[in-house]
Amino acid sequence: MQNNEEPFSKTRSSGQHPSGVHGKKSPRLPKCARCRNHGYASPLKGHKRFCMWRDCQCKKCSLIAERQRVMAAQVALRRQQAQEEELGISHPIPLPIAAELLIKREHGGSSSCLMLESSSTQTTSTSTSGSTTSSEGKMLIQEIPSITSRGHLESTSDLVMDSPYYSNFYQPPLYPYYNNLYNYPPYQMAVATESTSGNDMGGISGPSMKNSHRNHPAAYVPSQSGNQWQMKNGENRFPGHSASSQFRMHSYYPPYLGQSVPNPVCVPPFLTFEEIPSYSEAKASVALSPPSSQDSGIISLSSNSPVSNESTKGAAEQEPNSESSAFTVTTAGEDRE
């Protein structure tokens, strides 16, 4: 190996003079330090894996190994600091006048703000060692005229996160049952589904009404006022009638913030399926009201419609069935008494 490496150095030294220009020299090639310590000159490029003294423990080679460890630690430290600066979590920018404790007093303000620079846990030991030794045990009192004249202090506020401000976004809601913006009530609907003929409406009761209502949830949509339900189908049999207070249904979606927001406490209780009277008793209670009133029920029909003649016959046949039902029914007049 000595024969191959020595001529390389000779040809390199001899090749400098034949060149006509003395000012320009070929760049110096790096050599292996371990081989140089043992008297050999070998180029470093591609030689590290094949060096004969890479595991040598002599005094000179041990110094080389120690220097390599120190340089590797410095490179790793610089790389970590660069990553922290990119992520924005580096330590605050030190003030021009290094002070361990800074007391700031505003104009006419009795309270003073204390800033302890050594309380930052993200500062590295190398960056804080110089400032702590030079300013240890010193206190500086600085009068600041106004907030706008802080200068360099404004740049430090960008790096410090205001924890009370950001913690407001993650507070649990006041009503854990409702997890939306408007605190909607649970979806409950106590409106009888529409049947094909008028005489079928009196026969629906109890569980059958619940099952049929689940199959047709989209037959009713909230009106523009948001206080009652209207039919969505094309055959709207009751265009001029509005729902009475007994059959009036509150919509699922409350009005927007521009209107008056309903309070869930003040909403009247929803009617269950057992509390809805049958068609025949509702017909009898509505017949007592004057014909000019607009407060007739959803299930009631006008006297001029041809469907009412057919429905009255079916209601007369189903009166005994409604009286023998398991649950009790109260009309609107009895509730008011």
From Swiss-Prot:
Question: Which intervals of the chain are annotated as region Disordered?
Answer: 1-28, 113-136, 287-337
GO terms under cellular component? nucleus
UniProt-annotated location(s): Nucleus
Instruction: Give the Gene Ontology MF terms in alphabetical order.
Output: metal ion binding; sequence-specific DNA binding
Please give the InterPro entries that the UniProt record associates with this protein. DM_DNA-bd, DM_DNA-bd_sf, DMRT, DMRT1-like
Q: What is the lineage of its organism?
A: Eukaryota, Metazoa, Chordata, Craniata, Vertebrata
Q: Where is the composition biased (Low complexity)?
A: 113-135, 292-311
Name recorded for this polypeptide: Doublesex- and mab-3-related transcription factor 1
Write out the biased-composition intervals (Polar residues).
1-17, 319-331
Q: Which GO terms describe its biological process?
A: cell differentiation; male gonad development; positive regulation of DNA-templated transcription
Q: Which sequence positions fall in the DNA-binding region?
A: 32-79
Pfam families, per the entry: DM, Dmrt1
Q: Does the keyword Transcription apply?
A: yes
User: What function is annotated for this protein?
Assistant: Transcription factor that plays a key role in male sex determination and differentiation by controlling testis development and germ cell proliferation. Acts both as a transcription repressor and activator.
Q: Which family does it belong to?
A: Belongs to the DMRT family.
Alphabetically sorted, this entry's keywords are: Activator, Developmental protein, Differentiation, DNA-binding, Metal-binding, Nucleus, Repressor, Sexual differentiation, Transcription, Transcription regulation, Zinc
Q: What PROSITE patterns does its record include? A: DM_1, DM_2
Q: Is Transcription regulation one of the keywords?
A: yes
